[in-house]
Amino acid sequence: MALDVQEKAQIVADYQQAVGDTGSPEVQVALLTHNINKLQGHFKANGKDHHSRRGLIRMVNQRRKLLDYLKGKDLGRYQTLIGRLGLRR
Protein backbone atom coordinates (compact mmCIF):
# COMPACT_ATOMS: atom_id res chain seq x y z
CA MET A 1 0.00 0.00 0.00
CA ALA A 2 3.00 2.28 -0.28
CA LEU A 3 2.92 5.28 -2.57
CA ASP A 4 4.82 5.04 -5.80
CA VAL A 5 7.31 7.76 -6.64
CA GLN A 6 5.10 9.61 -9.13
CA GLU A 7 2.09 9.73 -6.78
CA LYS A 8 4.18 11.02 -3.91
CA ALA A 9 5.93 13.63 -6.07
CA GLN A 10 2.56 14.87 -7.37
CA ILE A 11 1.09 15.21 -3.87
CA VAL A 12 4.21 17.00 -2.61
CA ALA A 13 4.11 19.37 -5.59
CA ASP A 14 0.43 20.15 -4.98
CA TYR A 15 0.79 20.97 -1.28
CA GLN A 16 4.32 22.31 -0.84
CA GLN A 17 4.82 25.87 0.42
CA ALA A 18 8.09 26.44 -1.47
CA VAL A 19 10.28 24.50 -3.89
CA GLY A 20 11.86 21.53 -2.12
CA ASP A 21 9.38 21.63 0.77
CA THR A 22 8.61 18.06 1.82
CA GLY A 23 8.20 18.43 5.57
CA SER A 24 5.57 21.10 6.06
CA PRO A 25 2.41 20.01 7.90
CA GLU A 26 0.37 20.47 4.72
CA VAL A 27 2.51 18.00 2.77
CA GLN A 28 2.59 15.49 5.62
CA VAL A 29 -1.19 15.64 6.13
CA ALA A 30 -1.82 15.28 2.39
CA LEU A 31 0.41 12.20 2.18
CA LEU A 32 -1.21 10.64 5.24
CA THR A 33 -4.68 11.36 3.86
CA HIS A 34 -3.81 9.66 0.58
CA ASN A 35 -2.48 6.59 2.43
CA ILE A 36 -5.54 6.49 4.69
CA ASN A 37 -7.89 6.61 1.71
CA LYS A 38 -6.01 3.75 0.03
CA LEU A 39 -6.17 1.65 3.19
CA GLN A 40 -9.90 2.21 3.56
CA GLY A 41 -10.37 0.58 0.17
CA HIS A 42 -8.20 -2.33 1.32
CA PHE A 43 -10.45 -2.93 4.33
CA LYS A 44 -13.56 -3.21 2.19
CA ALA A 45 -12.07 -6.35 0.66
CA ASN A 46 -10.13 -7.56 3.74
CA GLY A 47 -12.27 -6.84 6.77
CA LYS A 48 -10.37 -9.15 9.13
CA ASP A 49 -6.94 -7.65 8.52
CA HIS A 50 -6.40 -6.36 12.04
CA HIS A 51 -2.65 -5.91 11.64
CA SER A 52 -3.14 -3.33 8.91
CA ARG A 53 -5.99 -1.74 10.85
CA ARG A 54 -3.51 -0.90 13.61
CA GLY A 55 -1.36 0.90 11.05
CA LEU A 56 -4.42 2.78 9.79
CA ILE A 57 -5.30 3.95 13.29
CA ARG A 58 -1.72 5.09 13.79
CA MET A 59 -1.84 7.13 10.58
CA VAL A 60 -5.17 8.70 11.53
CA ASN A 61 -3.78 9.70 14.92
CA GLN A 62 -0.63 11.16 13.36
CA ARG A 63 -2.74 13.17 10.91
CA ARG A 64 -4.92 14.44 13.75
CA LYS A 65 -1.85 15.57 15.71
CA LEU A 66 -0.46 17.41 12.69
CA LEU A 67 -3.82 19.08 12.05
CA ASP A 68 -4.06 20.15 15.70
CA TYR A 69 -0.55 21.62 15.47
CA LEU A 70 -1.39 23.51 12.29
CA LYS A 71 -4.67 24.77 13.77
CA GLY A 72 -2.80 26.28 16.72
CA LYS A 73 0.00 27.67 14.57
CA ASP A 74 -1.95 29.20 11.67
CA LEU A 75 -5.75 28.90 11.48
CA GLY A 76 -5.93 30.16 7.90
CA ARG A 77 -3.57 27.47 6.57
CA TYR A 78 -5.49 24.86 8.57
CA GLN A 79 -8.85 25.86 7.11
CA THR A 80 -7.44 25.98 3.60
CA LEU A 81 -5.93 22.52 3.98
CA ILE A 82 -9.04 20.80 5.31
CA GLY A 83 -11.05 22.46 2.55
CA ARG A 84 -8.68 21.19 -0.14
CA LEU A 85 -8.57 17.68 1.29
CA GLY A 86 -12.28 17.48 2.03
CA LEU A 87 -11.82 16.61 5.70
CA ARG A 88 -14.71 17.21 8.06
CA ARG A 89 -13.18 18.95 11.04
Swiss-Prot record:
What SMART domains does this protein map onto? Ribosomal_S15
An example GO CC term for this entry is:
cytosolic small ribosomal subunit
Q: Which UniProt keywords apply?
A: Ribonucleoprotein, Ribosomal protein, RNA-binding, rRNA-binding
Q: Which GO terms describe its biological process?
A: translation
Among InterPro entries, the record links this protein to: Ribosomal_uS15, Ribosomal_uS15_bac-type, uS15_NS1_RNA-bd_sf
Keyword set includes rRNA-binding = yes
Alphabetically, the GO molecular function entries are: rRNA binding; structural constituent of ribosome
Coiled-coil annotation reads none
What single Pfam family name could you report for this chain, choosing any that match? Answer: Ribosomal_S15
What this protein is reported to do is described as:
One of the primary rRNA binding proteins, it binds directly to 16S rRNA where it helps nucleate assembly of the platform of the 30S subunit by binding and bridging several RNA helices of the 16S rRNA.
Q: According to its UniProt record, which protein family does this protein belong to?
A: Belongs to the universal ribosomal protein uS15 family.
What is the annotated quaternary arrangement, including any partners? Part of the 30S ribosomal subunit. Forms a bridge to the 50S subunit in the 70S ribosome, contacting the 23S rRNA.
> Which protein, by its recorded name, is this?
Small ribosomal subunit protein uS15
Q: Which gene encodes it?
A: rpsO
